Curated annotation (Swiss-Prot):
Cysteines engaged in disulfide bonds, as pairs: none
Keywords: Chaperone, Cytoplasm, Protein transport, Translocation, Transport
Species per Swiss-Prot/TrEMBL record: Magnetococcus marinus (strain ATCC BAA-1437 / JCM 17883 / MC-1)
Keyword Magnesium (UniProt): no
InterPro entries: SecB, SecB-like_sf
A GO BP annotation: protein transport
GO cellular component: cytoplasm
Main location: cytoplasm
Job of this protein: One of the proteins required for the normal export of preproteins out of the cell cytoplasm. It is a molecular chaperone that binds to a subset of precursor proteins, maintaining them in a translocation-competent state. It also specifically binds to its receptor SecA.
Signal peptide: none
Protein name: Protein-export protein SecB
Organism superkingdom: Bacteria
Gene3D superfamilies: SecB-like
Family: Belongs to the SecB family.
Amino acid sequence: MSENEQAAKAEAPIFHVVKLYLKDLSFESPNAPESFSVESEPKAEFNLDTKATQKDDDHYEVSLEVNVKVASGDGKILFMAEVSYGGLFMVKNVPSEHIPMVLGIDCPNILFPYVRQVISSVVLEGGYKPMVLDPINFAALFHHAQQQKAAQQGEKA
C-alpha cells in the first residue's frame, strides 16, 4: 500500500456506535383500571426532542427523548409514557460542517427503533394495546430546525 493510500485510509470518515442505552423511562396510567373500558377514540399527543453532547474529541452522546400522552375523547388521561434513549457514537475524520447532520439525523435514526420498541412494550405492559409509533423523517426535522434557526438569526440582525 502506498503512503497516499495509507494516509487516505487513516483519514477516512468513521461513524461507529459505541453503546446504546435506556437513560430514563416513566409510565403512568392514572385512571386505571377504569381507563381500560374507555370506548371513545383516544387522542394522542407526541413530543420528541434530540440532544447531543460532545464527550471528547471523537465521541458524542445523543439522546432521543419521546413523550406520549394518550387521553380519552372526554380528556381523561389514559396513559403517559416518557422515554429517554441514549447512544454514544464515535464520529472521527468527519468535516466539522457535517457533524451536526450526523448528530441530528443519523444518530436519531439509529435510536428511534429502540425508542419505538420501549414505548410499545411499556404500553402493552400497562394493559393497553401496543402503541406503534410512525417512522420519523429526521432529515426533514433537522433541515426545518436549521431554517428556523437561520430565520431567527436574520430577525436579530
